[in-house]
Amino acid sequence: MFTGSIPALVTPFRNGKFDEVVFRAHVDRMIEGGSSALVPCGTTGESATMTIEEHNYVMAVCIDQTKGRVPVIAGCGSNDTKVSLAHLRHAAKAGAAAGLVVLPYYNKPSQEGLYAHYSYLAENSPIPILIYNVPGRTSSDISVETLARLSRLPAIVGMKDASGHIARVSAQRLACGSDFCQLSGNDDMALAFNAMGGVGCISVTANVAPKLSADFQKACAENRYQDALALQDRLYPLHSALFSDSSPAPVKYALSRLYSDFSPELRLPLVQPSDHSKALVDAALSHARLI
């Protein structure tokens, strides 16, 4: 089972190209900060603006740089089932431990369509799959009932839940079993999510505060919820500020404030965060005692 603080990695760019040197350094920072796994090529990694060749290369670089120190859960989502399967097969070949597969976006399949999509992938994928439910981005929302059906398939081992509905953690635990890996997709809800049966977070904030995020998850796992609450108070302004503009723009800005070699460059249609967002990020970094 995947547990703890799992950064959803940003993908650094410079002059329009993948900045491999900076990315490798970022991977090392995440691991040295206590992260328990890594997720490249997800939403935070701007996978939507990568070519398939770039996607596969970034994934492979991440796996190479980890050197087996932590597992890699590769972003393998697409709204084309066969493309998603191709990503899963490439991830397996590169050495990923699992694939994170977001609900198909834009084409808005029915619940039966979602079941067909994931069951096809489960039948054909060489690695385990975690379902990623983020209705705010996909306009699709997997039901507890559909999730329960899918959880019976051996290759479907868990989910990243960014639905924003905290009560679902209990409903999904009862429907899918306590061994079904539930990871929060919302940093600001991670404390409550873990208290209700979650086992970690695929985190945006961990890009900026890997050690604090890992310490927070460790406190939750050890039932030290007063310690976890203190860390949540320290991190909460950052959780909020990092979504004060289109993600991952604020995250990249924060990293550029912390590391001189990290460019805040994004790919269109994303643009730099507003001055207001930058001010919120600066204040949050100060509150967390990171600057």
UniProtKB/Swiss-Prot annotation:
It is an enzyme of class 4 (lyase). One of its GO terms (cellular component) is cytosol. Pyruvate binds at T44, I202. The record marks T43, Y106 as: Part of a proton relay during catalysis. Keywords: Amino-acid biosynthesis, Cytoplasm, Diaminopimelate biosynthesis, Lyase, Lysine biosynthesis, Schiff base. Its EC number is 4.3.3.7. GO terms for biological process: diaminopimelate biosynthetic process; lysine biosynthetic process via diaminopimelate. It comes from the Bacteria. SUPFAM superfamilies: Aldolase (SSF51569). SMART domains: DHDPS (SM01130). Pfam families: DHDPS. Pathway: Amino-acid biosynthesis; L-lysine biosynthesis via DAP pathway; (S)-tetrahydrodipicolinate from L-aspartate: step 3/4. The active site is at Y132 (proton donor/acceptor), K160 (schiff-base intermediate with substrate). Signal peptide: none annotated. Catalyzes the condensation of (S)-aspartate-beta-semialdehyde [(S)-ASA] and pyruvate to 4-hydroxy-tetrahydrodipicolinate (HTPA). PANTHER family: 4-HYDROXY-2-OXOGLUTARATE ALDOLASE, MITOCHONDRIAL, DIHYDRODIPICOLINATE SYNTHASE. Belongs to the DapA family. This is 4-hydroxy-tetrahydrodipicolinate synthase. The gene is dapA.
